[in-house]
């Protein structure tokens, strides 16, 4: 746990240093960008000022030309308007004359009609009066309009005179502007030549600066990609490590649950056997009584035969027959009850043995799974060690030339190896036949039925040698160190039952201390069995010890890998610092030379 916390703290400190470095690099690049942008802006402002002057001169010339065109158009429009107005006035005068003629004719007709019908039709007179009034109003209106039109005609004649004078002055100004435009065009052509030369020089400098910027940005991006790849690999490795830890904890919990169930079943079996023994003792009591009764009857028969009296013998003969038949009947009933009890006991023991076998099979499966996980962890550690060796070799070869390229290759190899590691983790149990003979031997030992207690001493005396042979045959040098650490792999297992009980107590104490140091957050059950069940307890304790040693090995491997990755990250950070310093010094020298 402390090593994990230390590795996590180191990873966090490395990440903080990386972030600070990236922040410093970004600040330096931004400063350089700001300086270059200021220089470019100054050049652009100069170009824009010159362009503005040119555009202003062009706009002045265009405005003058436009004003001349507008004035010409106005003159043409005024001439056409005057001609049209004169035509309109003539038309209106003709229309007025025509209307006056019509009015005169109508007036004469009305006057004639009035004289005719003045006497008979008063209503017609009133109408004629109204029409006369309306006609007089119309005449007055036409007179007022004619006055206004005369005023407008005079005003337009004055405007025509003023426009003629303006046209003359504008023609003089146009000639002056044409002369000025020619001079401006000559100046513009000279300024354009100068500006084109300055623009070409500035563009060449801009291209060179942009190339330098692109190269620096590409190096920074490549470094950022490398850092992100390293971070992603570290995250994936931590996630896989956490998942393996969770799976190991789940398997340990299942193993403990199965061990508890097996302990409970064995305790129930032990109780049932004690009950059977008590029943057998109770059944033996009437058999002993029968034997005593038979002895007494034999003594009585001998005494009575010694007396030799036939009459008394005949009298007592039916009584003796009754006494002899009664114990025979009792013995027959007792034998029947014993057979029935034995059959019931056999059925109960068979059911309990089947449950125990099922539990042992489950325990065997769990141990197989744990061993499969050990195999995957071993493969992962081998691959990581191989990759680290390749990293060291490539680093020693390419340290002077191109370290970032070797790190990219290592990252690519790590990414290519990750799916193989996941495939090994997800492989079925059947693929682990090369490493799992110990598992099959353990399962076979669990599947064996339990013998009578009378042979328990012999089994205990034979067990250590067989277990040592199978263990040495199946597992190689990896498990020898664990075997030397375990306190129960001693030759004292084949001794008497008192020594076995002491050994079990020592094992329990050692396991409680070991579990409290390794797994302080878990409540692990103590492994304690009776002295008459020492065989099963040794098997289960050996399985638990192998799991604990595998877990300890996995933690050591993970801490070692974390430290190696920290070293790799530190080396990469140092290289990034060197690259950033070299780029900064390069740009500083370039900026100084440019200022010079």
Curated annotation (Swiss-Prot):
Signal peptide: none annotated. The gene is deup1. GO terms for biological process: cell projection organization; de novo centriole assembly involved in multi-ciliated epithelial cell differentiation; multi-ciliated epithelial cell differentiation. Key structural component of the deuterosome, a structure that promotes de novo centriole amplification in multiciliated cells. Deuterosome-mediated centriole amplification occurs in terminally differentiated multiciliated cells and can generate more than 100 centrioles. Probably sufficient for the specification and formation of the deuterosome inner core. This is Deuterosome assembly protein 1. Residues 8-68, 130-180, 227-284, 337-402 form a coiled coil. Disruption phenotype: Decreased skin multicilia formation in embryos. It holds the Pfam family CEP63. One of its GO terms (cellular component) is deuterosome.
């Amino acid at each position: 746990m402390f090593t994990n916390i230390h590795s996590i703290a180191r990873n966090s400190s490395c990440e903080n240093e990386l972030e600070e470095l990236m922040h410093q690099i970004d600040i330096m690049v931004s400063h350089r960008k700001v300086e270059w942008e200021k220089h470019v802006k100054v050049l652009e402002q100069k170009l824009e000022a010159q362009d503005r002057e040119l555009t202003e001169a062009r706009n002045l010339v265009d405005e003058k030309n436009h004003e001349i065109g507008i004035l010409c158009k106005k003159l043409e429009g005024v001439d056409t308007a005057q001609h049209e107005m004169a035509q309109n006035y003539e038309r209106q005068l003709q229309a007025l004359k025509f209307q006056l003629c019509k009015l005169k004719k109508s007036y004469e007709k009305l006057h004639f009609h009035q004289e005719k019908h003045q006497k008979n039709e008063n209503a017609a007179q009133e109408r004629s009066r109204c029409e006369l009034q309306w006609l007089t109003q119309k005449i007055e209106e036409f007179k007022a309009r004619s006055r206004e039109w005369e005023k407008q005609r005079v005003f337009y004649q004055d405007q025509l005179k003023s426009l003629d004078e303006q046209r003359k002055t504008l023609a003089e100004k146009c000639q002056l502007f044409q002369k000025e435009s020619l001079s401006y065009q000559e100046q513009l052509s000279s300024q354009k030549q100068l500006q084109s030369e300055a623009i070409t020089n500035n563009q060449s400098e801009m291209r060179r600066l942009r190339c330098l910027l692109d190269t620096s940005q590409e190096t920074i991006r490549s470094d950022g990609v490398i850092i992100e790849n390293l971070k992603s690999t570290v995250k994936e490795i931590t996630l896989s490590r956490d998942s393996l830890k969770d799976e190991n904890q789940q398997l340990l919990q299942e193993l403990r649950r199965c061990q508890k169930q097996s302990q409970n079943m064995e305790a129930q079996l032990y109780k049932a056997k004690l009950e059977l023994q008590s029943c057998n003792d109770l059944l033996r009591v009437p058999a002993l009584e029968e034997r005593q009764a038979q002895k007494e009857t034999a003594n009585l028969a001998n005494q009575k035969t010694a007396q030799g009296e036939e009459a008394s013998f005949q009298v007592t003969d039916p009584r003796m027959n009754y006494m002899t038949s009664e114990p025979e009947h009792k013995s027959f009933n007792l034998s029947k009850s014993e057979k029935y009890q034995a059959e019931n006991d056999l059925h109960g023991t068979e059911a309990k043995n089947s449950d125990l076998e099922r539990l042992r099979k489950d325990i065997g499966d769990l141990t197989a799974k744990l061993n499969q996980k050990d195999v995957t962890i071993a493969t992962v550690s081998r691959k990581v060690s191989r990759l680290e060796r390749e990293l060291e070799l490539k680093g020693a070869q390419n340290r002077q030339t191109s370290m970032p390229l070797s790190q990219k290759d290592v990252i690519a190899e790590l990414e290519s190896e990750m799916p193989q590691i996941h495939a090994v983790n997800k492989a079925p149990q059947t693929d682990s036949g090369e490493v799992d003979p110990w598992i099959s031997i353990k399962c076979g030992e669990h599947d064996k039925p339990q013998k009578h207690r009378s042979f328990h001493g012999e089994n205990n005396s034979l067990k250590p040698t067989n277990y040592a042979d199978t263990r040495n045959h199946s597992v190689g040098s990896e498990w020898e160190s664990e075997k030397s650490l375990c306190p129960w792999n001693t030759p004292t297992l084949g001794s008497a039952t008192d020594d076995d009980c002491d050994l079990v107590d020592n094992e329990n104490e050692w396991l409680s201390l070991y579990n409290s140091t390794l797994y302080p957050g878990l409540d692990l059950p103590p492994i304690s069995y009776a002295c008459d069940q020492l065989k099963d307890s040794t098997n289960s304790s050996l399985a638990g010890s192998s799991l604990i040693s595998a877990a300890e090995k996995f933690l050591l491997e993970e801490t070692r890998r974390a430290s190696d990755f920290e070293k790799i990250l530190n080396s990469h950070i140092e290289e990034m610092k060197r690259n950033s310093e070299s780029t900064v010094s390069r740009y500083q020298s370039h900026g100084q030379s440019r200022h010079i």
